[in-house]
């Protein structure tokens, strides 16, 4: 494993910002404990999806209701990871509402 240009990029996505932040802190603490350099967590722009529906069925076109869904995202870069770092990250237990993408 050549350490010259090794980098692990982790993207976290979730609807609950507390769970996303908590997962990011766990990942950063685990990576630092194994001796790797960590850049982040970097907050990325929050996606906001708004859905508008009609409240009434027939003639009440002005009566509408809006719902929104926010997707919070964080980015973590682990620079010069060790084999111990990868092993500890694989064993890490994270909440169910957080989507994790890992790129090497």
Swiss-Prot record:
Q: Which GO terms describe its cellular component?
A: ribonucleoprotein complex; ribosome
- Entry annotated with the keyword Transferase: no
Which InterPro entries does the record cross-reference, listed alphabetically? Ribosomal_uS10 (IPR001848), Ribosomal_uS10_CS (IPR018268), Ribosomal_uS10_dom (IPR027486), Ribosomal_uS10_dom_sf (IPR036838)
Give the record's keywords alphabetically: Ribonucleoprotein, Ribosomal protein
Pfam families with a match to the protein in the record: Ribosomal_S10
Keyword Ribonucleoprotein set for record: yes
Gene3D superfamilies under this entry? Ribosomal protein S10 domain
Q: Which GO terms describe its biological process?
A: translation
Q: Which GO terms describe its molecular function?
A: structural constituent of ribosome; tRNA binding
Q: What does this protein do?
A: Involved in the binding of tRNA to the ribosomes.
- Fill in the subunit field for this protein: Part of the 30S ribosomal subunit.
Q: Which family does it belong to?
A: Belongs to the universal ribosomal protein uS10 family.
Protein name in UniProt: Small ribosomal subunit protein uS10
| Naturally occurring in which organism (per UniProt) | Alkaliphilus metalliredigens (strain QYMF)
């Amino acid at each position: 494993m050549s350490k010259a240009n090794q980098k692990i990029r982790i993207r976290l996505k979730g609807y609950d910002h507390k769970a996303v932040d908590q997962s990011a802190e766990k990942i950063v603490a685990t990576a630092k404990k194994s001796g790797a350099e960590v850049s982040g967590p970097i907050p990325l722009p929050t996606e906001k999806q708004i859905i508008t529906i009609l409240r009434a069925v027939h003639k009440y076109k002005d009566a509408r209701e809006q719902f929104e869904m926010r997707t919070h995202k964080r980015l973590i870069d682990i620079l010069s990871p060790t084999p111990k770092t990868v092993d500890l990250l694989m064993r890490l237990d994270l909440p169910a509402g957080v989507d994790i993408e890992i790129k090497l």
